Amino acid sequence: MVKNKVAPGQPKVSHLIRELRRLTGLSQEQFAATLGVAFSTINRWENGHMQPSPLALKQIKMMLNELTCSPVVELVEQSQILLVQYFSLSESSVG
């Protein structure tokens, strides 16, 4: 759980977490269990108090990649948008 400043022009990671949960239909508790973290960690990420660790970001990216294979067009489109916004340069660009 790394505390990083957001780079200018970079979308906040809290948006990424909320959107991924919305796309997957998972509660904060369910999302936490999927990533192997505590519920309070997800809550802190979404509220901008903490940033996900590099390992968590890797897992989040894998979840988004899996959604790009969905038969549901909206899931594919939204997951691709999030991948481009947050992971187009590298995991270290997420902030």
Task: Give, region by region, the residue ranges found by the protein language model.
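Short, charged recognition helix plus adjacent turn
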Residues: 7, 69-95
